[in-house]
């Protein structure tokens, strides 16, 4: 829900239904895998269908499982009758796969393949990773807090606030910089001592 809501908003629609009425389909491109975990992509598509998100399609760069391959997704969107397509990465970070495999100008990019099919009036790309969505960030924070509590042997239902999390990250970064600076200083001192001894 968070993922689709963000894509819909970024495309300028009030909701998924308004996009559907305008003939717009959203295609989320994940990585894919040959591992048995690939079933999660099929399950995600089934979940979208169950939610009534008829204009949401799940694909993968690796094309595994098969129904998530670019050609299969193009066919599914075409058969569903949508004329506008919005491509968006289903990845935490919008890196090489998003910029090149999805939105690149090469003929094998998803954007190029959708355009080359001749079935769509427009193909737009949203270059934004899941990690940019506040609600997804909170899921990571919650899971991290739960893992820390489990490792610490404590059970807690209280989750750090966004402010506390930001403070902790800032402190950790400062400590890391201080450690790195100290380490560099020690290395310089050791080199100076070595020169002095020689």
Task: Give residue ranges: language-model regions.
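Intrinsically disordered, low-complexity serine/threonine-rich repeat tracts
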Residues: 156-196
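Extended amphipathic ligand-handling, pore-lining, and cofactor/metal-binding catalytic surfaces
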Residues: 1-155
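Small/flexible residues
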Residues: 33, 196-197
């Amino acid at each position: 829900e968070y993922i689709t809501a963000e894509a819909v908003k970024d495309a300028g629609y009030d909701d998924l239904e308004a996009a559907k009425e305008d003939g717009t389909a959203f295609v989320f491109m994940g990585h894919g895998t040959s591992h048995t975990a690939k079933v999660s992509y099929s399950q995600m598509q089934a979940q979208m269908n169950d939610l009534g998100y008829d204009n949401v399609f799940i694909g993968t760069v690796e094309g595994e499982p098969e129904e998530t391959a670019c050609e299969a997704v193009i066919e599914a969107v075409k058969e569903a009758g949508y004329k506008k397509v919005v491509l968006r990465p289903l990845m935490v970070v919008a890196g090489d796969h998003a910029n090149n495999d999805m939105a690149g100008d090469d003929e094998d990019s998803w954007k190029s393949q959708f355009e080359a099919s001749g079935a769509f009036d427009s193909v737009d790309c949203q270059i934004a990773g899941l990690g940019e969505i506040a609600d997804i960030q909170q899921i990571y924070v919650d899971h991290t807090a739960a893992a820390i509590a489990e490792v610490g042997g404590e059970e807690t239902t209280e989750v750090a606030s966004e402010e506390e999390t930001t403070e902790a990250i800032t402190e950790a970064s400062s400590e890391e910089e201080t450690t790195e600076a100290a380490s560099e200083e020690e290395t310089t001192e050791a080199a100076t001592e070595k020169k002095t001894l020689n």
